UniProtKB/Swiss-Prot annotation:
Aquaporins contain two tandem repeats each containing three membrane-spanning domains and a pore-forming loop with the signature motif Asn-Pro-Ala (NPA). It is a multi-pass membrane protein. This is Uncharacterized membrane protein C977.17. It holds the Pfam family MIP.
Amino acid sequence: MSVPLRFSTPSSSPSASDNESVHDDGPTTELDTFNTTDVPRRVNTTKARQMRPKNTLKVAFSSPNLKGLDNTADSDSQPWLGGYLAGRLEDISGQSRRNYVDPYYEELNAGRRPNKPVWSLNGPLPHVLGNSVVEKISQKNQEARSRANSRVNSRANSRANSSVSLAGMDGSPNWKRKMKSAVFGSRVKLNDEEAQLPRNKSSVSIAEQAASRPKVSFSLQSSRQPSIAEEQPQTQRKSSAITVEHAENAEPETPRNNVSFSRKPSIAEQDSSQDITMPPNEIIAEESLDSGSDTETLYLNYWCKIRHFFREGFAEFLGTLVLVVFGVGSNLQATVTNGAGGSFESLSFAWGFGCMLGVYIAGGISGGHVNPAVTISLAIFRKFPWYKVPIYIFFQIWGAFFGGALAYGYHWSSITEFEGGKDIRTPATGGCLYTNPKPYVTWRNAFFDEFIGTAVLVGCLFAILDDTNSPPTQGMTAFIVGLLIAAIGMALGYQTSFTLNPARDLGPRMFAWWIGYGPHSFHLYHWWWTWGAWGGTIGGGIAGGLIYDLVIFTGPESPLNYPDNGFIDKKVHQITAKFEKEEEVENLEKTDSPIENN
């Protein structure tokens, strides 16, 4: 393993000034060095040496196999480029280290997901508006903009006509240039280096300020980041535009061995380099068919294509399977050992940690709901797509089915010993797979036990996942969700075994009926699994989300906070008023631009 060492090393530049080294306590060495404060882009060697600032920390690796790794790319501007040092420089500079990615890995990975929201239990929930609200806002905004455009164009035409008439009276347009210079400030064409220097706020014209402000508009199309194939033509067009604009003041490029730059190279300098390695166009794969591209999606193999369309369902399946393996396994272990293998507190923590691991497994793909009550609550109050709800529930049930099967198979010998034979199966061990209220609990009490427990679960989840409240640190949400499950189990779970999750009950119950416990597992406690395990949990989840949104949440994605027509009209009026001012300034500049060029 190579260890970074601090040395005072001479530069490899032929310039005399570059041979100066940074004095340090350590010895000198002839190993290749690299700069940790300003890593240039992947350009030619001469330009890379020119762009290094002097008197900076130099770091060398003791291993000779790491020589010649200086030409690493700027990972912030071109993340698809890379090298060995792309992941190590951030460690040396004291910042968090990003994972290394091979230059061609991202392009070959056809499973890249587009920029879509993920309703994850391991991070803040996305803020998404309903289609009806977006269509209403877009329609009103389009109508207001059309009216504003007509008014602005009429004003611009009237000013243009008056300008032509005045220019005809006076053959010299100098007075117009002076008036515009007094109002908007003088315009001076700058070269590429001067244009990037900071300017005083007073020297920026009103038109430039208006152009720098972002335009506010509404669109029904989903936003996504452009691919490399789409970004390259824009870079070339931008580079050509800069070259034409500064052609008059451009100076010939000469070697600057004694000059160090503290800025990043401009677009023109980037394009002038011939050593930038671009991946071949043949292997560039579009993100997804859902991203709006007409190019067919490429897949590594046939299974990758199947997984691409069912990835969210598979994630819910696997996350729920892990949840049930830990939970049902702890139930069976405590039962067959007559309490020696676990207590009620250990069972609660087992279910909580199982839920935590399930969320970590599926959180970045499907959200890690692992619970139909949570999925339905998110669809009602957080705009989770309704067409995904049955898909999620289907995979959650079957994940619980196979999770119960794995736990049962693991404890099969102990269950047989506990029951007294391999053909004997009683509700004593069957109750470890599915839930049932205690015999003395009334049906009203049993129902409201599940109702209240799931309401607390969903209400606390909405609070934890609300980034406008006090969300946990990134990556810690799933751990807190696990603690929440354990706390509910220890405080509100004794009378009904804290179902809280319809899939967790139905999946193992189906397996119990299939393995030999018989249909009696469905008939227990007057078909408890229908009105208790499903009705009580789903109703409680909806109630918990309703209470949180009623008293705390203010986002417009909740049905309790839908914007009415009056709010939309006022908001659109504010936007169009700002739009009119910006368009008026831009049209005034366009009208007077030919006169300035004269």
